[in-house]
């Protein structure tokens, strides 16, 4: 049933139904920062990624989905990058083979200087790991420049700078000003002449030659870091190709307000609105999110400007992503049809969390959060929004190729979005407990479309174990005799039995997660969807959560998997569990094939 990595499958052929109907792809979603390599320095890197590719290939997992890899600033969310193209330097593996000019003494000296137990931390200590890696890379760059390099390596670096100038020029200027501003990417706080690329270029032209040399030296270092990062990821792509493992990337709908992209060309964006998502039943833990929704802080796009340049910025963004990944997930693809906007920046969220509509309007020029370019209140508005999205969708498909695009179509989904995506051959995501019938039953497994990606969770959701344990605890507490506890218990039983009925098993009494874990995994794998992806925590049955929407906490985007990837198979219980999963799949395939 499952395509094995050794079969050299093509994800695009599977999702576009070019492969035989029985063929499917199983995958895992892992935040790179969470991986532990045998020799990482406090954050997952390209070496850990190679280990993951090896592990996946050995377990017949044909697809690895990652979160965005673009460079972040003071906010470490991979969905709030400071560049739509530049890669996060933290992903660079510090070894002499992959970093020209680097020596072991460089690493050792900086380790002594920082004095930090990089490999023993259970979270990514960005406040230490970022400056540590930056310091090591500066040492390596200095040696790269001063020591004799072979001509081929030097030519490779210089050629790369020339080829990437379209985005690199603005990025290195933006990033150099950030360094001058103690790492603060908020260009609105920079001197006026530094706030846009055009303004900075005018400032630069007026400098004395020695002052220009200082800037140019920093630009070269920043270019070199990006060259090293792109070089390493190109090798990861080649390594994955050799192992037959497909890589799925992630392109967020928006970019950071304080990004090199806005700095380069603010006219591409509508900076008066802040993109996000409306309130959803799934996210009720945060007062602001419950009241207003999620304010991501990303600027909206100026549609007229984007169309005037034939979506050149978007085309570049997709092309660069596809240099590393075989396919990509378009985060919040609903946004290409219509996007929810806030008339204030996220810094103001606490101010408006409990405010009335009238109070907000009085401070925001009569504006309230709303959909752009228009709501879906009438059939004609829905049709216009669908046409708006499909113009955008055609551009994405032109650049991504067949099967290269997967749409994250979760949340409050307009009724025209999924038919629109399917009509263009774009699969969306299917989370079983969000796929509901009119009577609140979970949609039966046989009603799922083949052109879909099935999963239990994204990086924003509770792992299966957390959800199950919470239900069981609520049920146990329901025997306290309190009316409220009894009501909560009955609701929890309803949730448990609804999911269990969908998955094909019974829960007559309280059961530990270990008793149902394999049953839930099997249920997802048996869906008709051509692609099935497990969050790594759901496959392993662990409780880590990587992000809580709306929360601002060190725990977001920082949790690390306890064991290095190279040691996962030393866990006998995990190894036995995975063996059972694949043994079960073989039996399913035999039945479905009539053998």
Language model segments and positions:
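Alpha-amylase-like alpha-glycosidases and glucanotransferases acting on alpha-linked glucans and related
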Residues: 17-24, 29, 38, 75-230, ...
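Gly/Pro-rich turn-and-neighbor structural signature
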Residues: 233-234, 247-252, 257
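Short acidic catalytic loops
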Residues: 61-68, 240, 246-252, 321-336
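Active-site pocket-lining segments that scaffold enzyme catalytic pockets across diverse folds
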Residues: 229-242, 246
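Catalytic domains of carbohydrate-active enzymes, especially glycoside hydrolases
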Residues: 21, 48-72, 324-325, 524
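Structured C-terminal cap/extension of enzyme domains
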Residues: 541-595
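Mature N-terminal, pre-catalytic/accessory segment of carbohydrate-active enzymes
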Residues: 9-60
């Amino acid at each position: 049933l499952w395509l094995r990595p050794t079969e050299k499958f093509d994800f695009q052929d599977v999702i576009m139904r070019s492969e035989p109907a029985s063929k499917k792809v199983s995958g895992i979603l892992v935040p790179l920062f969470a991986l532990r390599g045998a020799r990482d320095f406090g954050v997952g890197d390209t070496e850990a990624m190679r280990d993951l590719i090896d592990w996946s290939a050995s377990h017949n997992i044909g697809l690895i989905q990652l979160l965005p890899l673009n460079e972040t600033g003071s906010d470490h969310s991979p969905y709030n990058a400071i560049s739509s193209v530049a890669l996060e330097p933290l992903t660079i593996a510090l070894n002499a083979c992959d970093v020209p000019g680097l020596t072991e003494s460089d690493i050792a000296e900086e380790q002594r200087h920082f004095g930090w137990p990089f490999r023993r931390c259970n979270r990514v200590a960005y406040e230490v790991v970022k400056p540590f890696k930056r310091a090591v890379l500066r040492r390596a760059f200095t040696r790269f420049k001063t020591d004799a390099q072979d001509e081929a390596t030097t030519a490779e670096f210089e050629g790369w700078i020339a080829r990437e100038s379209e985005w690199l020029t603005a990025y290195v200027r933006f990033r150099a000003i950030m360094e001058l501003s103690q790492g603060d990417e908020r260009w609105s706080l920079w001197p006026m002449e530094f706030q846009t690329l055009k303004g900075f270029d005018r400032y630069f032209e007026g400098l004395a030659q020695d002052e220009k040399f200082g800037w140019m030296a920093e630009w070269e270092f920043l270019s070199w870091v990006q060259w090293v990062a792109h070089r390493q990821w190109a090798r990861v792509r080649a390594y994955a190709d050799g192992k037959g493992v497909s890589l799925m990337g992630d392109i967020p709908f928006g970019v950071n307000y304080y990004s090199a992209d806005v700095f380069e060309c603010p006219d591409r964006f509508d900076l008066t609105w802040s993109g996000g998502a409306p309130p959803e039943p799934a996210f009720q833990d945060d007062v602001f999110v419950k009241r207003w929704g999620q304010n991501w802080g990303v600027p909206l796009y100026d549609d007229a400007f984007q169309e005037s340049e034939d979506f050149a910025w978007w085309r570049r963004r997709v092309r660069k992503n596809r240099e590393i990944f075989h396919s990509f997930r378009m985060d919040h693809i609903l946004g290409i049809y219509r996007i929810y906007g806030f008339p204030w920046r996220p810094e103001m969220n606490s101010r408006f969390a409990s405010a009335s509509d009238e109070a907000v309007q009085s401070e925001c020029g009569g504006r309230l959060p709303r959909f752009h370019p228009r709501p879906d209140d009438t059939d004609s508005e829905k049709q216009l929004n669908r046409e708006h999205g499909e113009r955008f969708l055609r551009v994405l498909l032109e650049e991504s190729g067949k099967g290269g695009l997967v749409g994250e179509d979760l949340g409050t989904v307009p009724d025209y979005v999924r038919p629109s995506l399917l009509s263009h051959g774009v699969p969306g995501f299917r989370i079983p407990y969000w796929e509901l019938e009119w009577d609140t039953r979970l949609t039966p497994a046989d009603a799922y479309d083949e052109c879909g990606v099935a999963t239990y969770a994204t990086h924003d959701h509770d792992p299966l174990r957390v959800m199950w344990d919470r239900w069981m605890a609520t049920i146990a507490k329901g025997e306290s005799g309190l009316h409220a506890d009894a009501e909560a218990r009955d609701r929890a039983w309803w949730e448990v039995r609804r999911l269990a009925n969908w998955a094909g098993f019974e829960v007559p009494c309280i059961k530990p997660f270990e008793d149902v874990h394999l049953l839930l995994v099997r249920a997802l794998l048996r869906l008709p969807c051509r692609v099935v992806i497990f969050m790594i925590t759901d496959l392993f049955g662990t409780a880590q959560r990587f992000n809580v929407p709306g929360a601002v906490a060190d725990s977001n985007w920082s949790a690390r998997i306890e064991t290095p990837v190279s040691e996962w198979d030393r866990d006998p219980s995990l190894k036995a569990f995975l063996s059972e999963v694949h043994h079960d799949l073989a039996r399913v395939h035999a039945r479905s094939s009539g053998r």
